[in-house]
């Protein structure tokens, strides 16, 4: 047995339901457009009452059951769901500049070029300073090398001088140990009058004898004080000569002593020159 079909709805009921769905959709679109265009204005309230031709007809439950499900479904689906209003996004804030205006690209590029120019200038000045220091160090090195070479030359010269000095000092004979040139001899400090009195006293008691024998002691007695004075003079001259001429030998000093002639007084006019040897090794000419 086939189910009985529902009776077809009345045409007036179909048109009224479609008009109601269109009105609801139109109100929703208008409200959304007003909300987006004027967010601060309050949303207009829907009218409390609708015109009689817009109001849906109230039908009995029997009539509602007889509505075509296709029409009722399209009316329900045609109305979009109402979404809650979304808050409007706040405008983006500009970056914080802390009281300074943001620099443009051209100004920043100019500042970069100026900084690069200053850096190049500092680099060039530092390089020039380093080059000057290198030149100064090279000059000091050359001067040090010259002083080093001169030092070696002076050392060789000093060694040569020391060698020659040692060779020259080896030729000078050493003084005897009993002679001190810095202090005079004590036995030769007697004055000339004392020597004359001593000679006169020794000549008084001489015995008489032949002429040649008497003349010889008188000559020896007269030569005695002169020999002492001459020996003293020769010792002094020898000391001065050794200090002034360290490179000369004893022969030179002997020749100088032989060139000096002894002093003679009235009693020694006819005396002959005699040579005798002193204890100190120096030749004596009388």
From Swiss-Prot:
Residues 102-165 form the bZIP domain. It comes from the Eukaryota. Pfam families: bZIP_1. Disulfide bonds: none annotated. Residues 1-10, 41-54, 81-92 have a biased composition (Pro residues). Gene3D superfamilies: 1.20.5.170. It is found in: Nucleus. Residues 130-161 are annotated as: Leucine-zipper. Residues 1-120, 197-286 are annotated as: Disordered. Its main location: nucleus. InterPro entries: AP-1-like, bZIP, bZIP_sf. Residues 55-67 have a biased composition (Polar residues). Residues 103-126 are annotated as: Basic motif. Residues 26-40, 108-118, 198-222 have a biased composition (Low complexity). One of its GO terms (molecular function) is DNA-binding transcription activator activity, RNA polymerase II-specific. One of its GO terms (cellular component) is RNA polymerase II transcription regulator complex. Keywords: DNA-binding, Nucleus, Transcription, Transcription regulation. Putative transcription factor. Belongs to the bZIP family. This is Putative transcription factor kapC. It comes from Aspergillus terreus (strain NIH 2624 / FGSC A1156). The gene is kapC.
């Amino acid at each position: 047995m086939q189910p009985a079909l529902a009776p077809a709805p009345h045409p007036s009921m179909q048109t009224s339901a479609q008009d109601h769905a269109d009105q609801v959709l139109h109100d929703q679109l208008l409200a959304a457009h007003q909300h987006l265009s004027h967010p601060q204005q309050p949303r207009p309230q829907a009218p409390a009452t609708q015109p009689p031709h817009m109001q849906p007809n109230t039908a009995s439950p029997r009539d509602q059951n007889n509505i075509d499900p296709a029409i009722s479904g399209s009316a329900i689906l045609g109305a979009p769901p109402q979404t809650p209003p979304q808050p409007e996004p706040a405008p983006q804030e500009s970056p914080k500049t802390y009281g300074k205006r943001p620099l443009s690209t051209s100004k920043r590029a100019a500042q970069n070029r100026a900084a690069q120019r200053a850096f190049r200038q500092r680099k060039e000045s530092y390089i020039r300073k380093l080059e000057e220091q290198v030149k100064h160090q090279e000059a000091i090195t050359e001067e040090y090398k010259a002083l080093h070479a001169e030092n070696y030359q002076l050392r060789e010269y000093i060694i040569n001088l020391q060698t020659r000095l040692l060779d020259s000092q080896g030729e000078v004979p050493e003084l005897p140990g009993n002679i001190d040139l810095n202090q005079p001899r004590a036995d030769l400090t007697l004055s000339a009058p004392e020597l004359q009195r001593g000679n006169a006293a020794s000549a008084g008691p001489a015995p008489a004898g032949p002429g040649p024998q008497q003349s010889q002691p008188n000559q020896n007695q007269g030569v005695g004080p002169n020999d002492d004075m001459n020996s003293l003079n020769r010792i002094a001259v020898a000391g001065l000569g050794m200090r002034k001429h360290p490179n000369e030998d004893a022969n030179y000093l002997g020749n100088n002593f032989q060139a000096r002639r002894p002093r003679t007084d009235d009693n020694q006019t006819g005396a002959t020159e005699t040579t005798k040897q002193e204890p100190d090794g120096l030749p004596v000419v009388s």
